[in-house]
């Protein structure tokens, strides 16, 4: 009787639990409607509005309730558009932009930016150049005016050019102290040898010492054209106001090329190769290994980003030890293989670099490469649904958290319009991520990793870095 009573009680308790789980009140709890809320949140993101001026300059904005705004000009020009003779000209101009314009000479530009409590920044990459200002939303008219002045009226006084040479040369010395920056420049130099993508953004020191006012003027007149520019804004910005301001200040930007000499991108070939810079005086070795990756618009990028998320990243300061979700991180901890590692997928217009960078002591290099290549081969042959689901969730989190604040959103708008021709909505990114499954990861990884020639760059105490032919043989498995 007692046992029967227990069974009846258990059955009635189960039925009560089932009734509770079907309760509309419980289903409204945040924890049980997280998926729906996530999708709805993506669909409720403000729309990116895009307009085009008569001269071809694109104006794009995303309005939000932020009291601040970030406004920037993105230009489709970088070191890959430069020649061996003028390599570094774009980086030089970026520095001169902070030193005044024809209308605001000397430190007048800096004082005017500071007077409204704004922050001016600029950067150059191999394909893009950007100038951006973050300020209060009420100062939008002044911000657009300042950006227009910087882009159209950079001061190229001989005295300022000479002064800036020394500044850039000192910066280059500081950059050389960053082993990670050096090894990635080495990786580009060997992977894209003989092509414009091999050129560093800063250019060689010989060019910095040699570039003249004429070189910089020619660079400006050749590349700073309206159809290659995007004026982007994010934050407390109304699109119509931004468009009106752009019409006032940017409509005079030229869209005509002298003698119809429209710059074009030269396709850059990838070469499986290596570059080694051995320096036993350094405490740790930096090694980067990469295969050729897809260009910006290639749909394979999403599956490859999921694959990179599965391999993950690691730093010796992390907690978790051998219980980290990344198999490579667990092996690295258990065997004390490295100080850190990270995967990367660097995309350009038609090509890219897909691989990993790690920092370790001299005696662990060979083992680290062995286990890294083992993870790549495993993804090519036996990626599972559970780890793909984990990778997709990691990618979702990175996608959302990256766009936190007006500056990251503004950068995403400007970069997206130059690379994709449009701003891809978060909801569309989510649908692309959702389509990825284990079969897709295996197929895409096999396409890019399996039996492919890698590019390898090593810097530091790298005596134990394996011979290239041995590294190449690790890019496939003999399966029977």
From Swiss-Prot:
Q: Does the keyword Electron transport apply?
A: yes
* Subcellular locations according to the entry: Mitochondrion inner membrane
Q: Which UniProt keywords apply?
A: Acetylation, Electron transport, Membrane, Mitochondrion, Mitochondrion inner membrane, Phosphoprotein, Respiratory chain, Transit peptide, Transport
Gene Ontology biological process: mitochondrial electron transport, ubiquinol to cytochrome c; response to activity; response to alkaloid
Q: Which residues carry this modification: Phosphoserine?
A: 212
Q: Which residues carry this modification: N6-acetyllysine?
A: 111, 138, 163
Q: Give start-end of the signal peptide.
A: none
Positions carrying N6-succinyllysine: 163
**Molecular function (Gene Ontology), one example:** metal ion binding
- Membrane topology reported for the UniProt record: Peripheral membrane protein
Its Gene Ontology cellular component terms are: mitochondrial inner membrane; mitochondrion; respiratory chain complex III
Transit peptide segment: 1-34
Q: Assembly state and interactors?
A: Component of the ubiquinol-cytochrome c oxidoreductase (cytochrome b-c1 complex, complex III, CIII), a multisubunit enzyme composed of 11 subunits. The complex is composed of 3 respiratory subunits cytochrome b, cytochrome c1 and Rieske protein UQCRFS1, 2 core protein subunits UQCRC1/QCR1 and UQCRC2/QCR2, and 6 low-molecular weight protein subunits UQCRH/QCR6, UQCRB/QCR7, UQCRQ/QCR8, UQCR10/QCR9, UQCR11/QCR10 and subunit 9, the cleavage product of Rieske protein UQCRFS1.
PANTHER family from the UniProt entry: CYTOCHROME B-C1 COMPLEX SUBUNIT 1, MITOCHONDRIAL, METALLOPROTEASE
**What is its biological role?**
Component of the ubiquinol-cytochrome c oxidoreductase, a multisubunit transmembrane complex that is part of the mitochondrial electron transport chain which drives oxidative phosphorylation.
Full protein name: Cytochrome b-c1 complex subunit 1, mitochondrial
Species source reads Rattus norvegicus
């Amino acid at each position: 009787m007692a046992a029967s009573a227990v069974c009846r009680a258990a059955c009635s308790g189960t039925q009560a639990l089932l009734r509770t789980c079907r309760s509309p009140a419980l289903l409204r709890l945040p924890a049980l409607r997280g998926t729906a809320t996530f999708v709805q949140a993506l669909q409720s993101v403000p729309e990116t509005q895009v307009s085009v001026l008569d001269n071809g300059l694109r104006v794009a904005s995303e309005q939000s309730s932020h009291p601040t705004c970030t406004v920037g000009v993105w230009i489709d020009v970088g070191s890959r558009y430069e020649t061996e003779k003028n390599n570094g000209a774009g980086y030089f101009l970026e520095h001169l932009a902070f030193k005044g314009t024809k209308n605001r000479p000397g430190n007048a530009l800096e004082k005017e930016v500071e007077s409204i409590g704004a922050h001016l920044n600029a950067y150059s990459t191999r394909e893009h150049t950007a100038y951006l200002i973050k300020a209060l939303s009420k100062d939008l008219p002044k911000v657009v005016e300042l950006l227009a002045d910087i882009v159209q009226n950079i001061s190229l006084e001989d005295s300022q050019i000479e002064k800036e040479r020394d500044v850039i040369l000192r910066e280059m010395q500081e950059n050389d102290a960053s082993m990670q920056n050096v090894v990635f420049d080495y990786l580009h130099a060997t992977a894209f040898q003989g092509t414009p993508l091999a050129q560093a953004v800063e250019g060689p020191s010989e060019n910095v010492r040699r570039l003249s006012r004429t070189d910089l003027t020619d660079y400006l007149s050749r590349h700073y054209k309206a159809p290659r520019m995007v004026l982007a804004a994010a934050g407390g910005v109304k699109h119509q106001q931004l468009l009106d301001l752009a019409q006032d200040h940017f409509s005079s930007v030229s869209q005509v090329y002298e003698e119809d000499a429209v710059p074009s991108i030269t396709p850059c070939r990838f070469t499986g190769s290596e570059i080694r810079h051995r320096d036993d005086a350094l405490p740790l070795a930096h090694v980067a290994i990469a295969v050729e990756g897809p260009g910006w618009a290639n749909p394979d990028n999403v599956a490859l980003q999921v694959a990179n998320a599965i391999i993950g990243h690691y730093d010796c300061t992390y907690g978790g030890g051998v219980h980290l979700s990344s198999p490579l991180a667990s092996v690295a901890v258990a065997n004390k293989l490295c100080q850190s590692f990270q995967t990367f997928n660097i995309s350009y217009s038609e090509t890219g670099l897909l691989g990993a960078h790690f920092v370790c002591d001299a005696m662990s290099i060979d083992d680290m490469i062995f286990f890294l290549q083992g993870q790549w081969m495993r993804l090519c042959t036996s990626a599972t649904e559970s780890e793909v689901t984990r990778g997709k969730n990691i990618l979702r989190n990175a996608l959302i958290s990256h766009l936190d604040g007006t500056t990251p959103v503004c950068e995403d708008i400007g970069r997206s319009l130059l690379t994709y021709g449009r701003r891809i909505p978060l909801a569309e990114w989510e649908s692309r991520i959702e389509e990825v499954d284990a079969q897709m990861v295996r197929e895409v990884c096999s396409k890019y990793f399996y039996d492919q020639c890698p590019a390898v760059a090593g810097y530091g105490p790298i005596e134990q870095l394996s011979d290239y032919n041995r590294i190449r043989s690790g890019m496939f498995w003999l399966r029977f």
